[in-house]
């Protein structure tokens, strides 16, 4: 009988730990489409880190997952609260300076700026809001369609791709 009780206690503790980790630390996610290709492809399995959101550690270039209605999307942060941003002739400008990152140059996006957002009064991103963009220019499931992404809708940043094994990646570089 003591073995059964010990087993049940161990099982309950394991379930509590798993629930805690999935609620506050990390969660698994399957990439549902090719919006972030070639960085992430449909069917890739990733770990989403929730801690960076909790402690306001999200950075430009981070790939995040976020909720929009009942759907979960994956995009890249291109501008954070307190910054301005614009695309001019395929080049991303942040705070009126060109961004030197692979995701920011030679894009098929000609002219796109904060002025495209109806919900925004000025040229600066308000607190707790982000501008996100997919790596695929023709897939507009990002700020071009949704507008600003509120921090409360962000699940976390993609910090590890564990499948397919041949593409194992930790911390995606911009």
Swiss-Prot record:
One of its GO terms (cellular component) is plasma membrane. It comes from the Bacteria. Its main location: membrane. It is found in: Cell membrane. GO terms for molecular function: serine-type endopeptidase activity. InterPro entries: LexA/Signal_pep-like_sf, Pept_S26A_signal_pept_1, Peptidase_S26. The chain crosses the membrane at residues 8-28. Residues 29-174 are extracellular. Keywords: Cell membrane, Membrane, Transmembrane, Transmembrane helix. One of its GO terms (biological process) is signal peptide processing. Residues 1-7 are cytoplasmic. It is a single-pass type II membrane protein. PANTHER family: CHLOROPLAST PROCESSING PEPTIDASE (PTHR43390:SF1), SIGNAL PEPTIDASE I (PTHR43390). NCBIfam families: sigpep_I_bact. Catalytically inactive. Belongs to the peptidase S26 family. This is Inactive signal peptidase IA. It comes from Staphylococcus aureus (strain COL). The gene is spsA.
